[in-house]
């Protein structure tokens, strides 16, 4: 007969994220692309609010995310002010095919600075699968994100591209901000999952992980593991650069793609050897 007790949690950390942006930028599409988790709000009154939970893997830890879409209509700004309390991360979403939605990000940043100051945020350009209708250049959005100290992603829920990666990166930023990263990193014993990830990532460039015959969730975890541990290479503008290489000129880019050769120290005969022919040829 089993004894009743507190239920075992299916996650290690619980984070609350808000998706904000103008209406019709596809925030609901992002939530709908997440296959796991519940879609029912834990609160009785949630008019104008879309809610979903999902669980991601971050360095072998399970992070449960509560995702709230506060809608983008002006009358919901007051709702945003209420739901921003306790938020630990914010995704600023715009539509890359709608210039007006990108220009509206300034207004949302002002709302965040007023009602949720200091909360980590990232900039997300949605509907990358409609790039042929693009109105917001990638470089302009990236420069805007850097100016406002934000990480930048372009995502496509339809193609399942960069959605999980954006949530994973924001989770990492939040946990590092709160010092959680230090809890599990020092003196940890590597799990079997960590060892398998380390073995795969050590011999596979990060831009080739998507081509491995593995489930999407595992490939996403492998990329997250690679970035977190500074292993292998990262992709920048379609080219692979070694994480160990410095920010040098164009000459260093070519060298960064070459494998470093192992250099062995020169061998010499033992000094106390009495044989006259003790030499290394």
UniProtKB/Swiss-Prot annotation:
Keywords: Cell membrane, Cytoplasm, Golgi apparatus, GTP-binding, Hydrolase, Lipoprotein, Magnesium, Membrane, Metal-binding, Nucleotide-binding, Palmitate, Prenylation, Ubl conjugation pathway. GO terms for molecular function: GTP binding; GTPase activity. Pathway: Protein modification; protein ubiquitination. A lipid is attached at residue 273 (S-palmitoyl cysteine). PROSITE patterns: RAB, SOCS. The keyword Ion transport does not apply. InterPro entries: P-loop_NTPase, Small_GTP-bd, Small_GTPase, Small_GTPase_Rab, SOCS_box, SOCS_box-like_dom_sf. It catalyses: GTP + H2O = GDP + phosphate + H(+). Residues 270-281 have a biased composition (Polar residues). It is found in: Cell membrane; Cytoplasm, Cytosol; Golgi apparatus membrane. It is a lipid-anchor. Residues 72-88 are annotated as: Switch-II. Its cofactor is Mg(2+). GTP binds at residues 23, 26-27, 46, 72, 126-127. GO terms for cellular component: Golgi apparatus; lipid droplet; plasma membrane. One of its GO terms (biological process) is intracellular signal transduction. Pfam families: Ras (PF00071), SOCS_box (PF07525). Residues 245-281 are annotated as: Disordered. A lipid is attached at residue 278 (S-geranylgeranyl cysteine). Mg(2+) binds at residues 46, 69. The keyword Magnesium applies. Residues 175-228 form the SOCS box domain. Belongs to the small GTPase superfamily. Rab family. Component of the cullin-5-RING E3 ubiquitin-protein ligase complex (ECS(RAB40C) complex) composed of CUL5, Elongin BC (ELOB and ELOC), RNF7/RBX2 and RAB40C. Interacts with protein phosphatase 6 (PP6) complex components ANKRD28, ANKRD52, PPP6C, PP6R1 and PP6R2; the interaction leads to ANKRD28 ubiquitination and decreased PP6 activity. Interacts with DAB2IP; DAB2IP acts as a GAP for RAB40C. Switch I, switch II and the interswitch regions are characteristic of Rab GTPases and mediate the interactions with Rab downstream effectors. The switch regions undergo conformational changes upon nucleotide binding which drive interaction with specific sets of effector proteins, with most effectors only binding to GTP-bound Rab. This is Ras-related protein Rab-40C. It comes from Mus musculus.
């Amino acid at each position: 007969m089993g004894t009743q007790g507190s239920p075992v949690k299916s996650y290690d950390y619980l984070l609350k994220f808000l998706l904000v942006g103008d209406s019709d930028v596809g925030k609901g599409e992002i939530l709908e692309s997440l296959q796991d988790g519940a879609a029912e709000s834990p609160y009785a009154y949630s008019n104008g609010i879309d809610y979903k939970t999902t669980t991601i893997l971050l360095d072998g830890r399970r992070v449960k995310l509560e995702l709230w879409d506060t809608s983008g209509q002006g009358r919901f700004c007051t709702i945003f002010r209420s739901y921003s309390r306790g938020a630990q991360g914010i995704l600023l979403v715009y539509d890359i095919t709608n210039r007006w939605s990108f220009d509206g990000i300034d207004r949302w940043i002002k709302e965040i600075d007023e009602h949720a100051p200091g909360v980590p945020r990232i900039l997300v350009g949605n509907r990358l699968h409609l790039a042929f209708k693009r109105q917001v250049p990638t470089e302009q959005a990236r420069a805007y994100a850097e100016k406002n100290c934000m990480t930048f992603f372009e995502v496509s829920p339809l193609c399942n591209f960069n959605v999980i990666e954006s949530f994973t990166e924001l989770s990492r930023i939040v946990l590092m901000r709160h010092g959680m990263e230090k809890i599990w990193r020092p003196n940890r014993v590597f799990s079997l999952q960590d060892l398998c990830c380390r073995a795969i990532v050590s011999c596979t460039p990060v831009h080739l992980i998507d081509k491995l015959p593995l489930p999407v969730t595992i490939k996403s975890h492998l990329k997250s593991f690679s970035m977190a541990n500074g292993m292998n290479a990262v992709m920048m503008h379609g080219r692979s650069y070694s994480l160990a290489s410095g920010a040098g000129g164009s000459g260093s880019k070519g060298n960064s793609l070459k494998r470093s050769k192992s250099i062995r120290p020169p061998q010499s005969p033992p000094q106390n050897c009495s044989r006259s022919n003790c030499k290394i040829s």
